[in-house]
């Protein structure tokens, strides 16, 4: 007679408890930081709640179920980006879009990152977003096919027309000009995401492991050693301004590459990327192979030190003229001596990514 059914009352009760639980978590978190004085990033007790945003077709593989959740309260990020066109996002689309967004927003100038399986297969900066895209695509055109593209500027019609020339899974950017959407929306399956900025800016990130969770501060290119003015010249002569800009670009771009990572760059663009190898020699070889003739005269960044001089030797033999790396190996002197003997410049940052 106009009342609620038992099932409806149960559903409303569950919803009410989810709201009160979220509120209790917020209160407990605030009290730990503000009243008890615990470190807000790594408190003794940690709680959070999420609301399901969508059920996905499947997870990383077709036999895995999956869903995407947003934080309570919602925060800026890939999970809350506005999809303005295209097929439903997949689990892998979300993972790659997150990596692409972080890579593109590592730069203040117009930048484009093209991601496949969480690794950049193209990344570049330029005076315009269209130029940055064309340079990023030229890094590895074969691998860029079917990639996820992030732009840290509004997408113009010119950029949209360039991207429409090839198959792309996802494009994520702060905004899109109306004429750009008119071009891109002709591709009915292309997923277009509007994401106003680089993300929520939270200081930590977590990773679920069996029996618990690891939490760490987010790896951003903002440490003292990320400033080129703090780098130490350990071999060769100081570089000119153009080479210095390329070294700085290579160092920032290398952060988004899975270790062991070697990135070769020229004119504000990656020309060869070696990623995810279990030793630095193979990463150097892969970067040189991908760069082909473009390795000669390029600069290189390594995400960690050279444990031996052999990986550096691969770069020297390919014609790389300057290298930036963290340093810190017990055999640093061997790498420094090899660079000096080859007549190339080497800087150390004292920071690892």
For the regions a protein language model found, what residue spans apply to each?
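ATP-dependent carboxylate/acyl-activation modules
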Residues: 19, 23-353
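Beta-strand/loop-alpha-helix module characteristic of Rossmann-like adenine-cofactor folds
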Residues: 1-29
């Amino acid at each position: 007679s106009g009342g609620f059914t038992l099932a409806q009352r149960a559903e409303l009760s569950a919803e009410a408890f989810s709201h009160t639980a979220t509120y209790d978590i917020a209160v407990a978190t605030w009290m730990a930081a503000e009243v008890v004085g615990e470190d807000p990033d790594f408190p003794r007790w940690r709680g959070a709640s999420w609301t399901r945003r969508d059920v996905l077709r499947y997870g990383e593989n077709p036999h895995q179920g999956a869903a995407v959740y947003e934080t309570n309260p919602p925060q800026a990020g890939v999970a809350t980006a506005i999809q303005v066109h295209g097929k439903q996002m997949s689990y892998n689309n979300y993972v790659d879009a997150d990596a692409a967004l972080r890579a593109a927003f590592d730069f203040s100038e117009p930048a484009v990152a093209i991601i496949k399986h969480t690794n950049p297969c193209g990344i570049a900066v330029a005076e315009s977003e269209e130029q940055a895209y064309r340079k990023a695509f030229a890094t590895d055109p074969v691998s860029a096919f079917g990639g996820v593209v992030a732009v840290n500027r509004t997408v113009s019609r010119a950029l949209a027309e360039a991207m429409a020339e090839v198959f792309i899974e996802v494009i994520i950017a702060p905004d899109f000009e109306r004429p750009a959407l008119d071009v891109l929306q002709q591709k009915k399956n292309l997923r277009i995401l509007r994401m106003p900025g680089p993300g929520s800016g939270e200081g930590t990130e977590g990773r679920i492991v069996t029996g618990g969770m690891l939490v760490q501060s987010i790896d951003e290119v903002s440490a003292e050693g990320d400033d080129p003015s703090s780098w130490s010249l350990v071999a060769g002569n100081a570089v000119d301004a153009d080479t210095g800009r390329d070294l700085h670009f290579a160092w920032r771009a290398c952060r988004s590459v899975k270790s062991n990572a070697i990135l070769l760059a020229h004119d504000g663009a990656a020309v060869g990327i070696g990623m995810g190898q279990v030793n630095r020699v193979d990463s150097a070889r892969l970067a040189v192979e991908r760069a082909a003739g473009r390795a000669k005269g390029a600069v290189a960044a390594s995400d960690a030190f050279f444990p031996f001089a052999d990986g550096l030797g691969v770069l020297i033999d390919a014609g790389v003229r300057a290298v930036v790396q963290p340093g810190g190996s017990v055999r640093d002197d061997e790498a420094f001596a090899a660079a000096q003997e080859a007549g190339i410049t080497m800087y150390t940052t004292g920071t690892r990514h």
